[in-house]
Structures are given as C-alpha cells and as structure tokens.
From Swiss-Prot:
Any single Gene Ontology cellular-component annotation: nucleolus
Function description: ATP-dependent RNA helicase. Core component of the splicing-dependent multiprotein exon junction complex (EJC) deposited at splice junctions on mRNAs. The EJC is a dynamic structure consisting of core proteins and several peripheral nuclear and cytoplasmic associated factors that join the complex only transiently either during EJC assembly or during subsequent mRNA metabolism.
EC code: 3.6.4.13
Subunit composition and interactions: Interacts with MAGO1 and Y14B.
Binding positions (ATP): 75-82
A Gene Ontology molecular function term of the record: ATP binding
Gene Ontology biological process terms, A to Z: mRNA splicing, via spliceosome; mRNA transport; nuclear-transcribed mRNA catabolic process, nonsense-mediated decay; regulation of translation
Organism this protein belongs to: Oryza sativa subsp. japonica
Catalytic activity: ATP + H2O = ADP + phosphate + H(+)
Name under which the protein is recorded: Eukaryotic initiation factor 4A-III homolog A
Tissue expression remark: Expressed in roots, leaves, flowers and seeds.
Family to which the UniProt record says this protein belongs: Belongs to the DEAD box helicase family. DDX48/FAL1 subfamily.
C-alpha cells in the first residue's frame, strides 16, 4: 500500500489527501515535476499550463509510463489523468522523428479532442504534433494531417481503425498505446474495434489503461495484451468524490420529473448545471419542453453533427450557456470546471456510469451537488449505487440552494 497522497496546488487544485492508492510494490511517489526526470522544455510547458505540483495519480503513474512499463492506472474524473497522459506521451515521443509514435484511444470524440488540446498546450515548447482522429470530421483533413506527419494520434476506435486500414495512419513507429476510459472502451461495445487496432500495432508495444472504474472482468482482459503491468489503483469504496453532496427526489410518475425540474430552476441559483437523460429522444423532448416554458437550455447527444457538438461544448466551456441537457456522451472525462450541479433526470442504466456523471460536479475538489430523480421502481437501482460506492444518498432538503 502506497503512502497517503500529497495534494496538488494550483489552478483547479484538488485536495488529494483522502485518496488511498493500492499500488504495485515498488511504485515511487514523486512529489514534484522536477524530480521526474522530465526534459526542461517540457517542464516549461507544464508550468506554463498552470501546474505547480503533480496530483496523486501523476505522482505515481508518470514515472512507470515514461520508464516503458505497462500500466493500469485507476483514477476518477478530476484527478488530472488527461494531463498525466499528455505529460507522459510528450516525454516519450522523439519529436525529431515525424512519425506516429503514440496512439491514444478514447470512447468519445469530445474526450479525444480534449486530450489533443491538453497535449498541444503542455507540449508547446517541444513542438509536438498531435492530431485528433475522430468521426464526424472530414476524412480528407485526417489524410492531410497524417500524411504531413504527426507524433501522436488521439482518436476514437472506429476512425482510427479506418485510417489504419486505408494505410493513411502508419503504425510501424508506434511504441505506446493508451486506452483512456478503459472500462468504457473494453467493457461496452468497443472491444472488437480495440482488438482490430491492436492487431496492426508492432509487437514490442507498451500498453497503458486509464479509467475511473476497472471492474474485475476488465482487469482479467488486460492479461491478453499487457506484460507484467504496474497497477495504480484507487480503492473502490473511495471512488465517491469528496465534496459532492448527493440527494434524491422521489417522483411518483415520469411526468412529475418535468415539474420537479421547473421547481428546482425557480429555487436554485446555478452557476452551471448538467442534466442527464438516458436516451437521445429524451434529451430532444426535454430540451423542447424546457424552451417552450421559457427556460434557456442547450442540448447535446451523439446524433448531432460534430460541428454542432463542438459549438455547444465551446459555449458551455466558456460559460456562455449555463444549462446543458445531454446523454452519457458527455459523462466521461470532459473538463468543464464551473459545473456545480448535476441532475440525473434519469438514473443511469448501470452503476458505473453514475460516478462519471457525478464526477462532473466537483472536479479538482470544487464542491458540487448531485440530484437524482427517482421513481418507485428506481429505488432498487439507487440502493445498489449506494452499496457499490459505499455512499449515502439522502432525500433532498428544502435548503438545497444554500449547498450549491
């Protein structure tokens, strides 16, 4: 068992001291970026980006990754895992060689694009070339960028596989494969695409998996393509985010959820909020109904054109829009710091999605409130979530506005 963590301070600082990591024997805790053996021009980029001290997961995972080890790193949203990936990749890549050397796969276009942005920012002084290879964007642009030469591809499995099969994305120089949100990638529909990509990669390959939740069956699967991985794990019981107050509102019927939501709008002053529905159709229906009742909301789901999704994300990220209604496409790892309230209009279809949704409301230690709308038949799901995460979800108090 590794020692308790040292907290990171700086923009979006998180108090890490309550996180306890279960790590492989011999994993060092490196308390400063300067001690990691990172090149000077990369350090400049890290500090320019606003980091002062590594987060708990960064303190443990960066050194094994840049040393060439296979790594399974479990870290919840908001612990700095995207910047950990970016930092490690920037250190490993030889920028003098204009070939793809690292491939990062993510379950959503938005997460892949965010990884590209963070890596370009951190790697600014080393002139790293990164391309987000994602569906919904022009194949012609992918072909142009890849033929011009990039060091890193951050992409979604479908588009990356397509580019490899077209022989536009050449894999001969790839030495590092990173699967971000590995539970989503391997456990829920992406497994075949991952294996398709993996078959085209060189045999001497370093593989890293990073995710907020790593169920037992996912860990078993890693034995197929990882060699003696270093494990850096958060105890499951501690995956509930500190500082997030979780409540439920009992609603007798589905129709009552809408009235409850309107009541909350009247009583809460919200900086920014995300409302989750389980289906795209429900997102469209709720958005239309809210707007017809003179509430200003934006909406996003996977059927929308990529350009429209980018515009909506940009507006929400900048604070131009305050309330976003969405499906779980938004729930995994997207970095919008101002979100103070998450409403689960529908409880998620599985308990592991719950933490990805709730993680939105308290990133890097920001306090947050999560409110779950619960019908009678949902009580069992709610209790299952409570038990799984060893947490307590209380009935929403009258003074909930004071907690946001």
């Amino acid at each position: 068992m590794a020692a308790a963590t040292t907290s990171r301070r700086g923009p979006g600082a998180m108090d890490d001291e309550n996180l306890t990591f279960e790590t492989s024997p011999g994993v060092e805790v490196i308390s400063s970026f300067d001690q990691m053996g990172i090149r000077d021009d990369l350090l400049r980029g890290i500090y320019a980006y606003g980091f002062e001290k590594p987060s708990a997961i960064q303190q443990r995972a960066v050194l094994p990754i840049i040393s060439g080890r296979d790594v399974i790193a479990q870290a919840q949203s908001g612990t700095g895992k995207t910047s950990m990936i970016s930092l490690s990749v920037c250190q490993i890549v030889d920028t003098a060689v204009r070939e793809v050397q690292a491939l990062i796969l993510s379950p959503t276009r938005e997460l892949a694009a965010q990884t590209e942005r963070v890596m370009l920012a951190i790697g600014d002084f080393i002139n790293i070339q990164v391309h987000a290879c994602i569906g919904g964007k022009s194949i012609g642009e992918d072909i142009r960028k890849l033929e011009h030469g990039v060091h890193v591809v951050s992409g979604t499995p479908g588009r990356v596989c397509d580019m490899i099969k077209r022989r536009t994305l050449r894999t001969r120089a790839i030495k590092l494969l990173i699967l971000d949100e590995a539970d989503e990638m391997l456990g829920r529909g992406f497994k075949d695409q991952i294996y398709d990509v993996y078959r085209y990669l060189p045999p001497e390959l370093q593989v890293c998996l990073i995710s907020a939740t790593l169920p037992h069956e996912i860990l078993e699967m890693t034995s197929k393509f990882m060699t003696d991985p270093v494990r850096i794990l958060v105890k499951r019981d501690e995956l509930t985010l500190e500082g997030i107050k979780q409540f439920f509102v009992a609603v007798e019927k589905e129709e009552w959820k809408f009235d409850t939501l309107c009541d909350l709008y009247d009583t809460l002053t919200i900086t920014q909020a995300v409302i989750f529905c389980n289906t795209k159709r429900k997102v469209d229906w709720l958005t239309e109904r809210m707007r017809s009742n003179n509430f200003t909301v934006s909406a996003m789901h996977g059927d929308m054109p990529q350009k429209e999704r980018d515009a909506i994300m940009g507006e929400f990220r900048s604070g131009a829009t305050r309330v976003l209604i969405t499906t779980d496409v938004w729930a995994r790892g997207l970095d919008v710091q101002q979100v103070s309230l998450v409403i689960n209009y529908d409880l998620p279809n599985n308990r592991e999605l719950y933490i990805h949704r709730i993680g939105r409301s308290g990133r890097f230690g920001r306090k947050g409130v999560a409110i779950n709308f619960v019908k009678k038949e949902d009580i069992r799901i709610l209790r299952d979530i409570e038990q799984y995460y060893s947490t307590q979800i209380d009935e929403m108090p009258m003074n909930v506005a004071d907690l946001i």
